[in-house]
Amino acid sequence: ANSKLYTVDVDGNVNVYNNNELETLDTYKVGAVVPKDNKAVMAVEETSGDIYVCKGENGVAKISSNGQVNDNFFTCPTFTKPEKTELAGKVKGRANGIAIGSEYIYVACGGYGLVVLDKETGKTVCHRKANAYKNDDCGSANYVAVENVNGEEYVYVAYGQNRVQVFKVTKTK
């Protein structure tokens, strides 16, 4: 994106390289990816240059185009009522995938499902749990993509091993 290459390591170092010579332009510390084998996905907003980094259980970090790092842009929620009641308060969603839409940030947040965030504040606008239907065993939200089709925004979420769900973004009152 923006003629640059972006990488993140498990310790939370985001490196920005010149795409032509692979010279390091900038390095940012956003906090560790937990657990270490978790997906560490980034998205870069082309127009603003803002960088959003998934850190598993540690949520999402935002690096603003001015270099300011918010390592706690979005905090993954802790499950309060899981099926296995002994896990209440101990199991968290994991920020696995991220996509940038025209107005919102979309986070594939593991077993917690899809989370829609305000671009500026990181506050949750809405949430669709992964197991939205009774007897639904779809796994966790792993990857998310967004696409604009004829002026309408669609969000695609890949869950576990058995489905992709498509949402049309609408505004409600």
Predicted regions and their residues:
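Blade-level signature of beta-propeller repeat domains, shared across WD40, Kelch, NHL, RCC1
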Residues: G139-K173
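Hydrophobic core register within WD40 beta-propeller blades
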Residues: M42-V44, I98, V144-V146
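Loop/turn residues immediately N-terminal
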Residues: D11-V14, E57-V60, G111-L114, Q161-V164
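Conserved beta-propeller blade signature
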Residues: K4-T7, D50-V53, Y104-V107, Y154-V157
